[in-house]
Amino acid sequence: MHKHQHTASAKLAAPIRVMAVASCFAIASCGAAQSAPTPAAAHFPVSITGPGGATVTIAQKPHRIVSLSPTATEMLFAIGAGAQVAAVDDQSNYPSSAPRTKLSGFQPNIEAIAGYSPDLVVAAEDTGGLVHGLQALNLPILIEPAAKNLDDSYLEIKQLGVATGHGAEAESVVAGMRSQVGAFVASVSRPARQLRVYHELDNTYYSVTSATFIGQVYKLLGLSNIADSATAATPDYPQLSAEYIVAANPDLIVLADTRCCQQDLGTVAARPGWGAITAVKSGQVIGVDDDVASRWGPRIIEFMRAIAAHVQQLEKKAA
């Protein structure tokens, strides 16, 4: 999980930490890492191989799941496992029926988590000794890290389906997402000219490249991501400089920090030198829901539609 659902500092730390976590898991019985689990795997026990080759065995269908990942929470409810969720973290605000608590996925408290007597814990990253601490208590922990592309997202949904006994429902959710995304992309006309986009994660200029699920959305819509050309130690969530962004002169600026950092067209225009950027001069600085834009679950189609709508408006103005 990267910097989406927290304060600015927490939103920054997660993308960097998540790079150390493997981008996908494999259902042990399926062999290859990219093999998709099947509904048949809903028979328990099931074994899932996670980061570093460690295997997580779930002996019985879980009925007291603790989710420390807002994205995983959305996935669990989407596949029909909501009734099995006993607690979710403080950032899991969707759906509203999720049993939200003070648990933190960024600073996990092993004792507090164990207090919910979970038979499965799902998180986006192993931070603060989470995996070691839960394993010491013989509590199964499944890490589902930030997706690098839509296929990763689909795979994680299927894995959660297998882990919770909702394999068929998960397959149905994924099929629906694939169909929606495919149909939408096919229906959207590509920009007549190469439009440059800058996606802002927070007001210290962390961004995303095409090596992320967010970046893939821009690529599918025919946009050129200015972060792809940045030379940074972080290939997927680089921190850009103000000078780099101004020089790149994006046609569209997407703010995924409207809620966390209170950014909008006015605050962006007030930044030194930013008034010369094409997107700022033309008013093409748009805010998107911080959560929808940063979670790789079933609502990703909403983010895609929002961006496409603004691109079409930009094209009409240029015509």
For each predicted feature, which ranges?
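Alpha-helical, coiled-coil/dimerization segments enriched in small aliphatic residues
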Residues: 91-93, 99, 211-237
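Short helix-initiation/N-cap motifs at beta->coil->alpha
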Residues: 49-53, 101-111, 231-242
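Extracytoplasmic substrate-binding proteins
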Residues: 55, 129-206, 227-228, 235-236, ...
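A ligand-binding cleft/hinge motif common to bilobed small-molecule-binding domains
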Residues: 128-136, 252-271
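Bacterial Sec-exported substrate-binding components of ABC uptake systems
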Residues: 2-21, 28-71, 168-199, 309-319
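Short secondary-structure boundary segments
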Residues: 69, 125-126, 146, 203, ...
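Proline-aspartate-enriched helix->loop->beta-strand connector
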Residues: 62, 109-123, 139, 241-258
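A short, structured surface patch at a secondary-structure boundary
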Residues: 45, 64-126, 223-226
